[in-house]
């Protein structure tokens, strides 16, 4: 059917709003892209799970999203991908885990290519999916200019 894109500042209620949209459907999938590597992220994941309730199918993946989406496509009305920003960050650090002050020239191009390939997989999947895909992403460009390359 279509893609609904939800964006806003960090911790602005984007996920809660996106979930309220998804609750209009009966069969929901939550595609979580975060890697809960520290206690703060684990707490956020736990809060999100509690907020959603148990009547969601939850998939945790930040790459090969098309494979994850295809596994549930026939059994769902809506897919909530939360969030694109975490997906991009995970890909960035998977590709390069060095000093971001002196990134080799080829790294940004490799990251961009990988991210675009993942996004295109979701867009291609959307062409065959009969439900809606709700994509959540942080807005990162309208605030103060960050002092460091990673924000």
Role assignments for model-derived ranges:
Residues 1:
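Phosphate-binding P-loop
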Residues 4-73:
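Conserved P-loop
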Residues 4-6, 28, 74-83, 133-135:
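Generic beta-sheet signal
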Residues 34, 83-84, 136-139:
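A short beta-strand-to-loop transition that corresponds to the Sensor-1 phosphate-sensing loop
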Residues 38-45, 53, 76, 104-109, ...:
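Short, structured coil/loop segments at alpha-helix boundaries
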Residues 55-112:
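Helix-adjacent hinge/juxtasegments
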């Amino acid at each position: 059917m279509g893609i609904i894109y939800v964006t806003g500042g960090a911790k602005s209620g984007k996920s809660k709003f996106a979930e309220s949209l998804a609750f209009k459907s009966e069969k929901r999938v939550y595609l979580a892209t975060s890697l809960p590597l520290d206690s703060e992220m684990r707490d956020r994941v736990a809060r999100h799970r509690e907020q959603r309730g148990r009547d969601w199918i939850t998939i945790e993946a930040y790459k090969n999203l098309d494979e994850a989406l295809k596994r549930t496509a026939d059994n769902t009305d809506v897919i909530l991908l939360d969030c694109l920003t975490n997906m991009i960050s995970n890909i960035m650090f998977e590709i390069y885990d060095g000093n971001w002050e002196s990134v080799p020239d080829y790294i940004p191009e490799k990251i961009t290519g990988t991210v675009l390939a993942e996004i295109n997989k979701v867009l291609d999947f959307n062409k065959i999916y009969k439900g809606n895909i709700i994509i959540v992403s942080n807005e990162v460009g309208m605030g103060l200019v960050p002092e460091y390359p990673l924000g």
